Amino acid sequence: MYTREELMEIVSERVKKCTACPLHLNRTNVVVGEGNLDTRIVFVGEGPGEEEDKTGRPFVGRAGMLLTELLRESGIRREDVYICNVVKCRPPNNRTPTPEEQAACGHFLLAQIEIINPDVIVALGATALSFFVDGKKVSITKVRGNPIDWLGGKKVIPTFHPSYLLRNRSNELRRIVLEDIEKAKSFIKKEG
């Protein structure tokens, strides 16, 4: 019987060897994810940016700093949650990953979620949301904050990606994302 840590290490090693799509050709590092494997809440973004590609860590650039700040404002310590992305290699020029690239990485994300087995997943942005609704085009603006029933009784809470907040600085958008994080917290099952 493997521990969660051992299982996640197996996933990580497989991601490092992956050549299933062209994104592997230009990566500096794969960005598998990081955080608490015993968490009840997982945050999923789109894909690594330049800083993430350099460091091999998710959400460490400007959007990551904002995510950490939003978590703190919600009473969540970053080290208490798990943070990852749909794709594990940086798309060139930080473009949106193609459906083919997302599909090539999808089984890795599914494995991560299966290992952690959270109660709730926060989908950060339209690309992450698309993964949880089988690739359908859904407007994040229309569905954000509304829980989506997903595999194994998990709830997915869509919200805006922190990079969207950086591009559209607004106290109202910030308030909305904080509200969505609070809603996600409400789906965490109490132990015992």
Curated annotation (Swiss-Prot):
Its EC number is 3.2.2.27. Remains fully active after heating 15 minutes at 85 degrees Celsius. Completely inactive after 15 minutes of pre-incubation at 95 degrees Celsius. It comes from Thermotoga maritima (strain ATCC 43589 / DSM 3109 / JCM 10099 / NBRC 100826 / MSB8). This is Type-4 uracil-DNA glycosylase. Belongs to the uracil-DNA glycosylase (UDG) superfamily. Type 4 (UDGa) family. One of its GO terms (biological process) is DNA repair. Transmembrane segments: none annotated. The seven N-terminal amino acids are important for maintaining proper protein folding and increase temperature stability of the protein. Signal peptide: none annotated. [4Fe-4S] cluster binds at residues 18, 21, 89, 105. GO terms for molecular function: 4 iron, 4 sulfur cluster binding; metal ion binding; uracil DNA N-glycosylase activity. Uracil binds at residues 45-47, 59, 85, 161. InterPro entries: UDG_Type-4/5, Ura-DNA_glyco_family4, Uracil-DNA_glycosylase-like, Uracil-DNA_glycosylase-like_sf. SMART domains: UDG, UreE_C.
